[in-house]
């Protein structure tokens, strides 16, 4: 016989909601100024040219163009936006 009752809902429900982090616009894709490119905790990706960084380390585009990911010295990954050529 069980000496404790099967404890159900009162012991459940401690999991936090997912934060939806990660790359939102990938390399080679077009983006507009203000679009979020990467949501991250800390600087997993560093801001390159035409990229702004929010206070939660979110990277966003400052100009319209194409997203470009680069690997620099010491495997430091950065994100840039190559401006779109206006015709």
From Swiss-Prot:
Transmembrane spans: none
Gene3D superfamilies xrefs: 2.40.50.100
GO CC entries: cytosolic large ribosomal subunit
SUPFAM superfamilies on file: Ribosomal L27 protein-like
One Pfam family this sequence matches: Ribosomal_L27
Record key words, sorted: Ribonucleoprotein, Ribosomal protein
Gene Ontology terms: biological process: translation
Keyword Ribosomal protein (UniProt): yes
A GO MF term: structural constituent of ribosome
Family: Belongs to the bacterial ribosomal protein bL27 family.
NCBIfam families according to UniProt: L27
Designated name of the protein: Large ribosomal subunit protein bL27
Name of the encoding gene: rpmA
